[in-house]
Amino acid sequence: MADSKISPGMQQYLDIKAQYPDAFLLFRMGDFYELFYDDAVKAAQLLEIGLTSRNKNAENPIPMAGVPHHSAQQYIDILIELGYKVAIAEQMEDPKKAVGVVKREVVQVITPGTVVDSAKPNSSNNFLIAIDFDGSHYGLSYMDLVTGEFFATTLSDFMSVCGEILNLKAKEVVIGFEITAEQEEQLQKQFRLLLSYEQEIYTDDTLINPNLSQVEKNVAGKLLQYVHQTQMRELSHLQELIHYDIKDYLQMSYATKSSLDLIENARTKKKHGSLYWLLDETKTAMGMRLLKTWIDRPLISKQAISERQNIVETFLESFIERSDLADSLKGVYDIERLSSRVSFGKVNPKDLLQLGHTLSQVPYIKAVLEAINSPHLSKVIATIDPIPELESLIHSAIDPDAPATISEGSIIKTGFDQRLDHYRKVMKEGTGWIADIEMKERQASGINNLKIDYNKKDGYYFHVTNSNLSLVPDHFFRKATLKNSERYGTAELAKIEGQMLEAREESAQLEYDIFMRIREKVETYIDRLQTLAKAIATVDVLQGLAYVAEKNHYVRPEFASQKVITIQNGRHAVVEKVMGVQEYIPNTIQFNQNTSIQLITGPNMSGKSTYMRQLALTVIMAQMGSYVAADYAKLPIFDAIFTRIGAADDLISGQSTFMVEMMEANQAIQRASHDSLIIFDELGRGTATYDGMALAQSIIEHIHNRIGAITLFATHYHELTSLSEELGHLKNVHVAILERDGEVTFLHKIAEGPADKSYGIHVAKIAGLPGSLLSRADNILKQLESHSKDFIIKDNSQQSEENEPLNLLTEETSSQDIINRLKEVDVMNMTPMEAMTVLFDLKKKIK
């Protein structure tokens, strides 16, 4: 109900705000977007802008803050980045012509998942996700409102849903079902997502194939409904929904991708030091986005991989053409982003000029590809359409010096429209006519300083100072009186002014109408532009991969039909790039059909983790269609990679390192297949020694006996190396060490067999620990290695109660049980692992 104390304008604000309670409402008032009440208070703090009040002298002044409309986007970006929604209420009529309160409406709601017009555009996708549940399966759909891409899949459980949300790096998820409080908390707090809710289904058979599963049609329809509700317009650039299955790609969890530094360095959160950084030699924004997608989702189809490899090889063999191609690609703007701006009605003259320039480059790109004359390029060449009629329209219509905004005029080229040319001629000649009138009246009147000026209020007028008022001719009529001068008009000047003002108004309106027609025409080409964008992006990524392969001396990997790996002198591609080729020590990796697990021992800092990551990156590069860092590589095609490396542990969620270890290990145990790759680095280090060792052995046995996946398992539990006697497909390898005159050198080379020492004290020495501490540690180590029975080794230099040997038999209640258990033990026929298990059980009895 309206409040009698509130003005009609503020009541209008409150009515609109009530429709968008979860968003900041930017309320257009003249040249500013204003915020009121709680929105103003909160925005002033978040945006660091001034907080004032409306009706300051009233009993309850209204908090108010505002931002200029021309710079509003930067403030909107800040709010969106912080996870808020922003509703934009525009003036829907000219305030000068309005009767009563100016009509205002919300024209768009901008959310973290629907950003298309950021002041800081980047080359990454921004996916908006929707999820739904039909009682047995989850539907997940996502789209990028910039590129128009639209996908849907079916998932079996909520864990898979969470995994896909993390992989897509979404900021906003639309919920289409009755979500549980636990699920909501996980998405909202643990993953820090903005959750929106939508139950209605938008039906569009042109975008959503009726033959899709019902849960996918429902979730895609709810996503479309949310998009239409927030964007409030038909979006012509949205592409037909594509069904996908996560099993169609090499599956990797978000933790795996993070620990392998695929898109960004896990430690620095920067591009530098990632696989993306290494491989990114793209020249276009579309290519950069596609490269990220390829790294994120390597293929499992040998044919599809080979098609990419064939083009990379073709480019490698065509150095001159590839160089010309790269130069041409540098002149290509972001076609996908430009197409979305057309669809959203936000395209400006500069955007069209960029599109026109891009289209002018396409014939050169196509000609270079055709000159290579390779059958491997025929498919992509067929999709490269220069769209000459659109390029011609833009270049014939848009002035190359056109401003960025439509309202400034001077957009349309002279010669494009006869009426517009006529109005411009009138305005141009009118300026000359006014100059002639000025000269004529100056001579006739004898007023030597007589001149004609212009302002919006009085139009054109003669400026006459008070000292010359006696010379003013009779046909002059007064328009305005100032302190030291008068302003006059004449019938002749008024006539010319009328013609010029009419020409100016008609010209401005006509130019606007012409631009709108051109924009509508461009919109009809969006499908062809998107096809062109995909083709150029593909060519861009592949030429970049060829450049990287040539520069770094990579080889084309072969794919084996059997589970065998031969990587000769393989390198960790990213580490090699950072260190330099001369510094990096390559390693050969081999798995035959009789080996599925390599148990890797050796000291920290010796290169175990790099060796394991090297294999994972080689697999990813190979299956995305890239060449790999090796002298020779032959691999099977893997269906998934599971890792537990630990570089990207996130303890903020409240989970311990050990819990994270076990969760990631469990994911591999539950989901890995015979065709997967498993990489475990120091599994079990997050708990007590015997706990960790027991779990490590059990997991190794499970992988060996039940899964059969190729596995690299690095461990500091040297006792586990004895498992090779029991597990026929397990092979011990270690990092070679050169020990001479008490000094240790890490060779960073993998050798067969288990490590004989851990060299932990040497690593501590490198880290700079005090000499006295190292000497004490060395003394303890020697006593342990001599099988001392004491649990704590005495320090002869410092006697204290704390150095006394630990007596396990301090309680009579437990001593007899322990004695009985020891009597049962057959020491001579026990393995080291069984002996440790017994000791572990005994230790638990005395706790």
UniProtKB/Swiss-Prot annotation:
Write down the PROSITE patterns for this protein, in alphabetical order. DNA_MISMATCH_REPAIR_2
- SMART domains the UniProt entry points to: MUTSac, MUTSd
Q: Which domain of life is it from?
A: Bacteria
Q: Which Gene3D superfamilies match?
A: 1.10.1420.10, DNA repair protein MutS, domain I, MutS, connector domain, P-loop containing nucleotide triphosphate hydrolases
Q: Where does ATP bind?
A: 602-609
**Its GO biological process terms?**
mismatch repair
One Gene Ontology MF term: ATP binding
Query: Which keywords has UniProt assigned to this entry?
Result: ATP-binding, DNA damage, DNA repair, DNA-binding, Nucleotide-binding
Q: What is stated as this protein's family in its record?
A: Belongs to the DNA mismatch repair MutS family.
- List the NCBIfam families: mutS1 (TIGR01070), PRK05399.1 (NF003810)
> What is the recorded name of this protein?
DNA mismatch repair protein MutS
Instruction: State the encoding gene.
Output: mutS
